[in-house]
Amino acid sequence: MNIQDSIDHVSDGNNLNQEQMTAVMNQIMQGQATDIQIASFLTALKLKGETIDEITAAANVMREMSSTVKTNKKILLDTCGTGGDGCQTFNISTTSAFVIAAAGIAVAKHGNRSVSSSSGSADLLERAGININLNPAQVAQCIDATEIGFMFAPQHHQAMKHAANARKQLGTRTIFNLLGPLTNPAGAKHQLLGVYDDKWVEPIAAVLKKLGSKRAMVVHSKDGLDEISLSADTKVAELNNGKIKTYTISPKKFGLTPCKLSDLKVENVDQSFAIFLSVLKGEDGPAKDIVVLNAGAALYIGNITKSLAEGIKLANKIIANKSALEKYELLKSASQKSSTSQQIEKKSE
């Protein structure tokens, strides 16, 4: 099925099977569709409602066309979420990644610059002095050496450029907003994945199952966060051994002090970086608590602890002994060395 036929098919309220969706996505990602065709298709798909099969097929095409980051790690975890929750908080999942890495889980962090927030993961890490423009081999070196590496989405998903204009002109969420966390270039099989709307919690968990993920938690809080929240209950769909169970996480249950969402908000990347550093240095407050909560969940799905409660305790210890701060310094140094070696290689050529 080509994209012209799919627009009519989807506009009439019909779903695409995986074979049909694969054909259309290949056409888009290979630059064989016009901006107006892409925009029409994405809009029709959104109005109909994207299905699990459609999202799975689209993610598989993106995975096939992305770069491949090959590491020596047996377990890789990602904390990339959909973003777009509109809450303007500091970079919770990115900060959590350093706590997770300090516990011994290799983190292949996938991310991008901000679209709707004050600071995207790439914006924060760049402000923190980390080189985000590494090629796949250099990212793999960072992960193997330091347990953490960052994959800047535009560097690894070159084919996405064919949909960029249509997406920009549309200016609304489409299936592509869901695909980023589903297309980790390192093939991470363990994920803590926040979504911008609770309607996607269970479907995205089902997509991860189809894509071969081993363990994952897909989350969305009642206050709108695509994270596990301190200020409201959070809906969770947990994937483990091919089975999905849905439940609610309440911060009070784990002895964490509830806070207002406004306590976590920032206006720019400088403010986000300041909070990032304060958390890694162990300064008490709601920012540290929400990082501990989310990192604890990742330690649980990364098989380091047997429960979320144990994960939270371990995350607290890691921050207290400054090992998460050390991970940040290690990645900063490793990424800069990779950048220097890349420049030397180019000069020698």
Indicate residue ranges for each PLM-predicted region:
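Acidic, glycine-rich active-site loops and adjacent beta-strand->loop/helix elements
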Residues: 81-86, 111-117, 156, 222-223
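A glycine-rich phosphate/pyrophosphate-binding beta-strand-loop-alpha-helix module
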Residues: 42, 90-146
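N-terminal basic/disordered segments at the start of proteins
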Residues: 1-14, 79-85
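Helix N-cap / loop-to-helix initiation motif
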Residues: 17, 34-35, 51, 93, ...
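Short glycine-rich or small-residue beta-strand-to-loop segments that form or flank ligand, phosphate
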Residues: 11, 42-46, 78-83, 298
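Active-site cofactor/substrate anionic-group-binding motifs, chiefly glycine-
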Residues: 49-111
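Glycine-rich anion-binding loops and their surrounding alpha/beta cores
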Residues: 9, 64-67, 89, 104, ...
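N-terminal glycine-rich anion-binding loops that anchor highly charged ligand groups
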Residues: 1, 10-56, 64-71, 290-291
